[in-house]
């Protein structure tokens, strides 16, 4: 059984027991989060596709922790003009463990 949820403007395919990293959520470590924006639920041969969400479907997850991704570098350069600019960015994330899929 798996589901497709929407979080942080992105869609994630989740399976019970799996851990995944999503955009930063305002939740404390150890707390439980319920996702109501379930776009699809697949259980064996049964497939439920929402329009836009599956009615009554929920995905629960436990917050494992928060952190930051690896640094990415943004570099601007103009050739022959001796102009170079560097910037770095580390995006925050929330790590979740999927505890249940219903629907």
UniProtKB/Swiss-Prot annotation:
Top-rank taxon of the source lineage equals Bacteria
Look up and give the organism this protein is from: Acinetobacter baylyi (strain ATCC 33305 / BD413 / ADP1)
Xref: PANTHER family: 50S RIBOSOMAL PROTEIN L21, LARGE RIBOSOMAL SUBUNIT PROTEIN BL21M
A biological process from GO? translation
Q: Which InterPro entries match?
A: bL21-like (IPR028909), bL21-like_sf (IPR036164), Ribosomal_bL21 (IPR001787), Ribosomal_bL21_CS (IPR018258)
| Record key words, sorted | Ribonucleoprotein, Ribosomal protein, RNA-binding, rRNA-binding
Write out the similarity annotation. Belongs to the bacterial ribosomal protein bL21 family.
Per the entry, what this protein does is: This protein binds to 23S rRNA in the presence of protein L20.
Q: Does the keyword rRNA-binding apply?
A: yes
Signal peptide from the UniProt entry? none
GO MF annotation, one: rRNA binding
Q: A Pfam family for this UniProt protein?
A: Ribosomal_L21p
TM stretches of this protein: none
Would you tell me the protein name for this molecule? Large ribosomal subunit protein bL21
Assembly state and interactors?
Part of the 50S ribosomal subunit. Contacts protein L20.
GO terms for CC?
A: cytoplasm; ribonucleoprotein complex; ribosome
